[in-house]
Structure formats: C-alpha cells, structure tokens
C-alpha cells in the first residue's frame, strides 16, 4: 500500500484535533486586554503549546513519509497508536487550562506528551524495520539524539510536578518549562532529513 491514504487520513485527524482545541477556547466576558489576559490567558497559552506540538508532529510525520514508498499493516497500526495519543491533546489541554496548571492535570499532560513521543518512536522503528537498516530514514534518524533528550525532558517535567513543591507551583512551573523547551528544540528543523527528502525527489 502506498503512503498517500495514510498521510491524508493523518492530516485529517490532526486538523480535527486543532479544530477541537480552538473550540475549547472561551472568549472573555469583558472587552479589555486585561479581561483577555486574566480570563483567557491560561487557555491561550495552553492552546499555543499544544498547537505547536501538533504542528511539530505534522511536520515530522510529513517529512518521514517522504522517505517511505509503501506501508504495511504494522506501520498502519503504529500510526494509529500515534494518532490516539495526539487525539487526547484537546482533553489534556482543556484540563490544564481549567485547572490553571494544577499538579495532576500538568502531570497527565506530560504523560500524554511522553506517550506521543514514544508512539512516534515506535512508528519510526516499525518503518525502519520495513525499509531496512540502510534506508534513507535510518540514515536521517542517526542516533536520534533529539528523541532521547525529549524523553528525558518529559520525564523531568513529570517528576518535577509530582515531587517538587507539591502545594505550590514551582514543580508545575519546571514541568511546563521542560515541555516548552522540548517544543522549541523540535521547532528547529533537522537539515539531514530535508536533504534526504530533496535527494529522493531528484532521484524520482
């Protein structure tokens, strides 16, 4: 099976996830900037973080499948596993918003981010197994340093929220900083993948 249907389905699911998240945003009661900041500020911040993450996954997913010609059943199921965890973003994002970054919602949000990262790694591994050890994707991924750093930051954030200043906001603040830092790291594109995609397009 070629990758077109899988990519189209994934794009549609990600678009729906973003739509659901933005529909969860609540307009402030007043008409001033102060009303916006105090009543909708947390919601806008959590939406922004989650939107960036969805954008990162869409971008990486798009580039990854440019290096793949066909998919099998294992790839389809691994892709569904990734979409499952990403589809929970509207729920976990809304909970963090409504709780104003309370400890348990932040921990669950971090677990969702970690699970999505693991699911992406599983998808990547299944594709490499299908394509072979010398495949373009395997060369592009290399030692996957970013993936290892990401998992470490997610775990650091989760553990910080669970153990540091349990009655205050220091632990959750560290957790959010870890999650934002991970997103910033992934916003910077991996030039190796871009080069390999261009090489594949030229060879076609």
Question: What are these model-derived regions, one by one?
Answer:
Residues 1-204:
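Multi-pass alpha-helical transmembrane bundle typical of ion/small-solute transporters
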């Amino acid at each position: 099976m070629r990758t077109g249907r899988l990519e189209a389905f994934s794009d549609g699911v990600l678009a729906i996830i973003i739509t659901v998240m933005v529909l969860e945003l609540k307009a402030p009661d007043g008409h001033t900037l102060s009303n916006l900041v105090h009543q909708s500020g947390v919601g806008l911040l959590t939406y922004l973080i989650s939107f960036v993450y969805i954008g990162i996954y869409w971008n990486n997913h798009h580039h990854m499948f440019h290096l793949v010609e066909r998919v099998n059943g294992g790839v389809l199921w691994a892709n569904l596993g990734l979409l499952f965890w990403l589809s929970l973003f509207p729920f976990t994002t809304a909970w963090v918003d409504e709780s104003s970054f309370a400890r348990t919602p932040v921990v669950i949000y971090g677990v969702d981010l970690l699970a999505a990262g693991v699911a992406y790694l599983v998808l990547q591994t299944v594709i490499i197994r299908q394509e072979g050890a010398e495949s373009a994707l395997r060369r592009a991924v290399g030692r996957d340093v970013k993936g290892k750093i990401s998992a470490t930051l997610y775990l650091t954030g989760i553990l910080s929220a669970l153990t540091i200043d349990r009655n205050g906001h220091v632990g959750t603040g560290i957790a959010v900083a870890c999650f934002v830092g991970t997103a910033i790291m992934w916003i910077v594109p991996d030039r190796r993948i871009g080069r390999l995609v261009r090489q594949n397009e030229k060879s076609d």
